[in-house]
Each structure stands twice: as structure tokens, then as C-alpha cells.
UniProtKB/Swiss-Prot annotation:
Keywords: Cytoplasm, Phosphoprotein, Ubl conjugation pathway. This is F-box protein SKP2. The gene is SKP2. It comes from the Eukaryota. Residues 54-100 form the F-box domain. It comes from Saccharomyces cerevisiae (strain ATCC 204508 / S288c). PROSITE patterns: FBOX. Interacts with SKP1. Component of the probable SCF(SKP2) complex containing CDC53, SKP1, RBX1 and SKP2. May interact with ribosomes. Coiled coil: none annotated. Pfam families: F-box-like (PF12937).
Length: 763
């Protein structure tokens, strides 16, 4: 009863008599006296039981406990530090100091003073009572593995090293910089909080030491504080610059090649150009210069990972000035970090000036191509481009090839343009390629209306109007040109297009196209077809793959492992050409037999049809789309010959010949006679019939997987988590990945969380 009084007295206990209450109070008083006598022994027993209980969380192995703690947020981890010494030891040594985020210049100053004071983690929970749970004190600067600088500033650095400065003490500063006056206010606020705090955690000596160190670094600029922090963290492997503004710049004064010599300062003050890769082709380097440069290069600090994430908030607001608002990559952005092994760029624009090679400011590898010929290469071995724009033209691909010769791992994430796949051929040492298949350039392709495939009629002359007005006296609507002017999006045409029987540039080919003025792209999906695929939850990547198939086939594949990420396989399966043509041949045969039995039952149908939703007025709509199922029917008198029909027939003939040689069932099949006796125009060109285009995603998936089979190894990461993926057995995965497994390529499939769903041939 006494423990329930912590929540207050309830009005429902008023029914108990006062005498009974007094008796209960006397009993509770005796119990309290007894509990005071045994308090010490009770604490010891409870403490021993707490740590000896095998069912408690603390008895879990350290690896398991770390996995559990890794799922918690930062605030929860800070709260758990006060539970006991083991939690404090694990959290401080494994989580709190591993990934540091600094969001202001004041936070940089505080953290810089903290690590220079040789701060050690200590046990907050005093006298835990068990030697096995005592915290191990470690130096905080040795625990930091990653550090992030949010919204880095460069105005104070530009002001410090500019010849214009504030002489009169005014707030306006020349040279495009501004004065940071919020520092003193932040310091006063922090001091007030520190003085008013009733439970100080650190001692007064520690506070005095931190204040002294802060005063020593008070006049440092933002970039100087950043570099000083990086230099004082020996185990640092990752540096992140996030929310970088487009006007952010790092002056060349902070280059790692700045040795304090007068020659280096003269180059910057006079604006002298550094030696570049182009200069090495015209000038001869002395052996002394090469030896001195190599000694400087190999003595530079090394950084494993550098990430630069541009701030894209302004880009969404000012769409008209999007190109000017985006952060443009310049060599000065990473000239102060030393030799970088892995570079990750996000929302950054890359142009020809981004790949400049100033070897006297930027650490570049000087490679001896020949006895007297040298070339400059970036030391980066892993490159990640996330939502980056590559400005085309001016030999950008050639510069990529010469600049990133040492890159072995390339990752293209959230690709903005499908033509960025051409960059994959610009890395001579490439061995591992990662492509994001859920990028907008693969899922948001252009779709057209059905009128795209027909010749538009214009009613310009009076005779046309008279003819159309006279049509109202009959039961027929105005006739429209039902001839298709470009290869339509049917399964047969898309398959012939993917197998190179039809060229995507046939619009300009006089030999294949009788009307070369027609520059329309073939097999463009219509809006109705895309809606049909979306209702079936078919991924857009497989629906549009024939749009960019040529770009995927141009990817380098020799001795290269590919990692395909964010790709779904919902409601699709690989349909091989032989299976498709075999099914189509059976369908054509069954349709012909049915037509012979039906006879003349459909004589009452009209020869010309229109869409049901077309407007039927006295003056017909010139953009009305013909109903191809009626126009291309065997009873129709309208027959058109298309230049792509022969290409589709050749694709069908070659597949039937292969099928005849492989299958006993079709050995007696006369291929030429079969092609002459059947009518194929309806199956080839009627893109309005769902039966004629339903297999486009399945055909595209087969071509996509067949293209992946050319690589050394294939790794696939699904778009969704395991619980949201289509449940498949190992046999189902083998059927899905059959085009890849036929060539014995090692393949591995994981879900979004990294759980292995299928593996074959992996070591």
C-alpha cells in the first residue's frame, strides 16, 4: 500500500474506516523500522541478484548488446549512460564519440578545446560495486572515426587572407565577406547556463582549462578550426561537409603544399597558374623537381573518405536559376585534406574546370608513362556520384579518363541523366561498378499519346469540309489515315528492337525507312500502356528498359563486377525470344483455326472504327485515333505495308529455325511456308490490344539479365525490405535469374537491409 502512495491518495479509499487506517499505519511503521535495520544487507543482495541474473540484459554478450544499442537514437543512448558503468563504457567508447556532428563555428571551438585538453571518458556512475563493470577510461580524440561539418563557412577565411579588410570597424566588409558577430552572444549564453547549473558534471579545474584553450583558438577561422580538429584526430577515417552552400570556397592558402615558403605565397598573391597535365606534354620536368615533388607527395596526410554534400534547398525554390545555384566542384574544395582514397559527391555539378590538375596546390599522383613523359592522376580509388550533374561537351569524357585513372570502384546513385552511364567507360582501372536502377532517369521516361503513331490530317481546304459535312448524311464518320508511321510499342517490335533487328535510328535511314523525314523514335510507350503496367504493379524500370538498352550494353564488362541496387522484380519474369515466338506461333495457329469455323458471323461489323471516347460532331476531329483492331482485321479492305515488318519477320524466322533445331516437336515445321500462310500484321502493329504489348516488361527483363551475364560477378540489392518483397523459394530465384545462371556467373541477391535472399557461386 505504501508504494502506491507515490501516485497520491485516491478518493475511492474513503470507504475504509479510520480505525482500520490507524492499524495499517502502525503495521507499516514497524515494517519501516525493520527495513532500516536490514537496508545494507538488502542493497547488497539486490545488487548481486541484479548482476547475477542470467535473464537480464546485462548478461548478453558484448557483440549482441552492441547490435541492440546500435538501433537506438542519440538521445536514448545519452540517457542509458546514466544506468550503470557498463552501459556508459559501451556507449561512450562505441557510439557517442565515433560520429561527431558540428553545426556551427562555436561548436567547432568547443570541440577543438575539448580534444586538446586530452579529455578522457570516465565513470559517471560511482561505486558500482563490481570490478567487472568498471569503465575503461579512454582519450576522446582516439575514439572519433567520423566527423561532419554542417553548413561550413568560408567568409572569415576569405576576409583574413584578402587585402581588403575592415579598418573603421564598420559592419560592412569588402571582398564579399561578412562579419560574424554572433559568437560573443553564444559564449554569454553558454556561460550563463554553466553558472546557473546546480549539478555540474565536470570540475572547476576542467572548466578553467577549457576556457583557456577556447581563448587560444578564439581568433581561428572556421576552416582553420576544421583543419586543426582533423589533424588532432589520429583515428579519423571519414570527413563530411554537408549542406555546403554554392558560394563556399577554400582559399589556396590552406593547401597541404603550403610549406610557408615565400615562393608559395608569391604564386597565390600574383595569381600564377600551376603546372597542369597539359603543361607536362609541352615542358620537360627535371629529375630534381620530380624527386622533390614525390617526397612532398608521400609525406602528405591521408584521408580514407571525404564526402561533400551540397545544399539543394535553394535549387528547389529558384527553379529558373537552378544551374547557377548548384555547387560546382573545384579542386580547391579538397586541396586541404591531403591524399583522399574515396570521394563521395552529392548534388554537385562537374564541368571541365572541376577536373583541372594544379599539381602545386592539389595533391596529384605523378606517374611516369614513359622514360621522359609524365602524367598527373587523382589518387582517388573510389568515386561516388549521388544526384550529380555532369556538364556535357568540351571533352569532358576525355578529362574523366585522364583524371580518374586510378578509380577502381564507381557508384552512380540517383542518376539525373541516363547518358551518365557513358562515364563508366572513362575509368581504365574500374573493377567494381554500382548503378542505382531506381533513379528518375530510368523510371520517369517520356510517354506519348496514340496519335503519335499516325499521320495527322488537317482540314485546310473547302473540299475537305464539304466532304466531311456530306459524311453526316451517312452512317459513317469521317475517314482518317490509319497508317502507322513509326514502329509501334508491341511485344514483337520491342523484341526485334532489343535484338538489333530494328534500329532506333531507322527514322533517318533511307534504306530502311521510305520517309526519312520522319524522326520519331520507335516503340515509345503510350500513356494507356503505362497505366496498364502500373495497374499490374509492374516496375517502370522494366517497362522502359528498351529506351536505354543501348546505354546499358555499352557498359564495360570485362573483369568488372556489377552491383545493381534498388531494383524490384514485382510481377515480372524473364521471357526469352524462343519462348515468346513459340507462344505467338501457337496463338496465330489457334486464331486461324477459329476464323475458319466462325465464317461470316461478323459481316455486320463496320470496316472503319474509332475510339469510343472520340467526339462525334458534324465536323470530325482531325486528331481522332483509328481502332487498329478493326482496321487490321482480316475482313478489312485496308492493308498497309510497313518497312519494319520484314525486320520482325526475320527475327521470327531466326527464332523458329533455332526452335526447330532444338525441339523434336518442331522438326517437321516448314518455316517459310508458315510465314507465308499466316497473317502477322495484327500481332506486329496493333499496339492498342493488351495481348500484343503485355510481354514488353518480361522481354526487357530477359534482355537486362542477359546483359548482366557479361560481367565478372553480379550483386543485386532489392528496392524493398524482406517483409515487402515477393516471397520466392530458391527454385523461384533460379527461374528468375536463369539468363544469368546459364553462363555460370557468380550472383548474390540481398534485400534492402542486406539480408541474403539468394546466392550462387559466391566464395
Amino acid at each position: 500500500m505504501k508504494r502506491l502512495q507515490l501516485f497520491g491518495r485516491s478518493k475511492y479509499f474513503s470507504l475504509v474506516s479510520s480505525a482500520a487506517k490507524e492499524e495499517e499505519e502502525e503495521e507499516e511503521g514497524c515494517a519501516d523500522a525493520k527495513s532500516l535495520l536490514h537496508s545494507t544487507s538488502h542493497d547488497i543482495k539486490s545488487r548481486s541478484l541484479r548482476f547475477n541474473d542470467k535473464s537480464s540484459l546485462m548478461c548478453l554478450p558484448t557483440k549482441v548488446l552492441l547490435l541492440i544499442l546500435r538501433t537506438l537514437d542519440f538521445n536514448t543512448l545519452v540517457t542509458l549512460c546514466q544506468v550503470n558503468s557498463r552501459f556508459y563504457n559501451l556507449i561512450t567508447n562505441e557510439f557517442l564519440f565515433q560520429n561527431v556532428i558540428l553545426d556551427s563555428k562555436l561548436s567547432l571551438l568547443k570541440f577543438n578545446a575539448l580534444i586538446h585538453s586530452e579529455f578522457h571518458t570516465s565513470n559517471i556512475v560511482t561505486h558500482s560495486g563490481d570490478c567487472s563493470t568498471q569503465s575503461r577510461s579512454q582519450n576522446a580524440r582516439f575514439l572519433v572515426r567520423s566527423i561532419e561539418f554542417k553548413n561550413p563557412q568560408s567568409q572569415d577565411s576569405l576576409l583574413k587572407y584578402s587585402k581588403f579588410y575592415n579598418k573603421s570597424g564598420q559592419d560592412s566588409i569588402i571582398a564579399g565577406s561578412y562579419k560574424l558577430d554572433s559568437y560573443d552572444k553564444d559564449v554569454k549564453k553558454l556561460n550563463n547556463i554553466r553558472l546557473n547549473d546546480e549539478t555540474p558534471i565536470i570540475t572547476s579545474e576542467r572548466i578553467k582549462l577549457l576556457d583557456k584553450l577556447e581563448s587560444n583558438y578564439f581568433h581561428y577561422t572556421y576552416i582553420e578550426l576544421m583543419l586543426d580538429i582533423i589533424d588532432y584526430l589520429p583515428n579519423l577515417t571519414r570527413v563530411i561537409l554537408s549542406d555546403v552552400e554554392p558560394n563556399f570556397k577554400i582559399p589556396l592558402w590552406y593547401s597541404v603544399f603550403n610549406d610557408g615558403s615565400r615562393d608559395f605565397f608569391k604564386k597565390i598573391i600574383k595569381g600564377q597558374q600551376s603546372i597542369t597535365n597539359e603543361d607536362l606534354r609541352t615542358f620537360q620536368l627535371s629529375k630534381k623537381f620530380v624527386k622533390e615533388y614525390e617526397s612532398k607527395y608521400y609525406s602528405l596526410p591521408r584521408l580514407k573518405i571525404l564526402e561533400i554534400k551540397a545544399n539543394n534547398k535553394r535549387q528547389r525554390t529558384f527553379n529558373r536559376q537552378r544551374h547557377h545555384q548548384k555547387l560546382v566542384l573545384r579542386p580547391s574544395l579538397f586541396c586541404c585534406f591531403g591524399i583522399i582514397n574515396e570521394l563521395k559527391l552529392e548534388n554537385v555539378t562537374i564541368d571541365t574546370e572541376s577536373l583541372d590538375t594544379p599539381m602545386e596546390f592539389l595533391p596529384l599522383f605523378l606517374k611516369n608513362e614513359d622514360n621522359e613523359l609524365y602524367s598527373l592522376q587523382s589518387p582517388i580509388t573510389a568515386l561516388t556520384l549521388d544526384s550529380c550533374d555532369v556538364v556535357p561537351g568540351n571533352g569532358i569524357l576525355r578529362l574523366f579518363h585522364s583524371y580518374f585513372k586510378m578509380v577502381k570502384h564507381l557508384s552512380l546513385l540517383k542518376i539525373n541523366s541516363k547518358f551518365d552511364l557513358l562515364l563508366c567507360s572513362c575509368f581504365p582501372s574500374l573493377s567494381n561498378l554500382t548503378i542505382d536502377c531506381n533513379s528518375k532517369c530510368f523510371t520517369n521516361e517520356q510517354v506519348v499519346g496514340e496519335s503519335y503513331y499516325f499521320q495527322q490530317r488537317s482540314l485546310d481546304t473547302e473540299d475537305d469540309f464539304d466532304d466531311c459535312n456530306s459524311m453526316t448524311e451517312t452512317l459513317f464518320e469521317a475517314p482518317s489515315d490509319s497508317k502507322i508511321i513509326t514502329p509501334p510499342p508491341t511485344s514483337s517490335v520491342v523484341l526485334s528492337l532489343n535484338l538489333n533487328y530494328i534500329s532506333r535510328t531507322t527514322g533517318n535511314d533511307v534504306s530502311n525507312n521510305p520517309s526519312p523525314d520522319n524522326n520519331k523514335k520507335p516503340a515509345m510507350l503510350t500513356a494507356a500502356q503505362l497505366q496498364n503496367f502500373q495497374r499490374q504493379r509492374i516496375p517502370e524500370f522494366h517497362s522502359f528498359y528498351h529506351y536505354y538498352r543501348l546505354l546499358w550494353e555499352r557498359l564495360p564488362s570485362k573483369n568488372i563486377s556489377i552491383n545493381v541496387i534498388n531494383i524490384p522484380f514485382t510481377n515480372v519474369y524473364p521471357l526469352s525470344p524462343l519462348s515468346f515466338w513459340e507462344h505467338l506461333a501457337r496463338t496465330i495457329t489457334s486464331v486461324d483455326e477459329t476464323d475458319e469455323d466462325v465464317g461470316d458471323e461478323n459481316d455486320q461489323e463496320t470496316l472503319i472504327g474509332y475510339e469510343n471516347n472520340s467526339i462525334r460532331d458534324n465536323i470530325p476531329n482531325a486528331n481522332a485515333v483509328p481502332n487498329l483492331s478493326t482496321v487490321m482485321s482480316p475482313e478489312s479492305d485496308i492493308h498497309h505495308t510497313y518497312y519494319w515488318n520484314n525486320s520482325v519477320r526475320r527475327c521470327l524466322r531466326d527464332s523458329l529455325i533455332k526452335l526447330k533445331n532444338r525441339t523434336i516437336e518442331y522438326r517437321d515445321l516448314d518455316v517459310e511456308e508458315f510465314l507465308q500462310n499466316v497473317t502477322l500484321e495484327n500481332f506486329f502493329n496493333d499496339f492498342q490490344d493488351p495481348e500484343n504489348f503485355k510481354d514488353i516488361p518480361n522481354i526487357n527483363l530477359w534482355c537486362f539479365l542477359r546483359n548482366l551475364s557479361k560481367f565478372k560477378a553480379v550483386k543485386i540489392r532489392m528496392l524493398r525490405h524482406f517483409s515487402l518483397c515477393t516471397p520466392r523459394t530458391r527454385y523461384d530465384w533460379e527461374l528468375l535469374l536463369k539468363p544469368v545462371l546459364r553462363v555460370n556467373v557468380p550472383i548474390e541477391v540481398r534485400d534492402k537491409d542486406g539480408f541474403v535472399l539468394y546466392s550462387y557461386g559466391q566464395k
